[in-house]
Amino acid sequence: MPSPTHKNITTQIGCHLEEVAEMLTVLKSDNPFQSMAIADTIASLVLLSDRLKAYGEDTYVREEDRAELLDALCDQIVTATGIGTFFGMNVPGALSEVNRSNYSKFVDGNPIFNENQKVMKGPDYTPPDLTPFI
């Protein structure tokens, strides 16, 4: 079982929200109110993500809420897979490729972290090729 620090946890949650914001950047609408709502949501997620990564020490999940957190994380995985499937994407294959790429960041089997505990790209890093899965 890993032993992450509180900073590691809030940084990881911030990174997760950053990825949700990134997904929303490709969501377009011809309705100006919908476009504004998307832009506002992206801005809010980016702000929260940045704050969690920099100042997350006062943010936490209560022990009694851990089951609810796990349920929400699982639901996010299921719904994210569903979105990709609806677009005809091979999400499990793409996930394997992204994992391969992420592990190529490691040096001697270990991640390299920056001062914010973000995993950095090592010298043997290769980006994921998602083309076959779209």
Predicted features by range, described:
Residues 1-73, 77-134:
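Flexible "arm" and connector segments at domain edges
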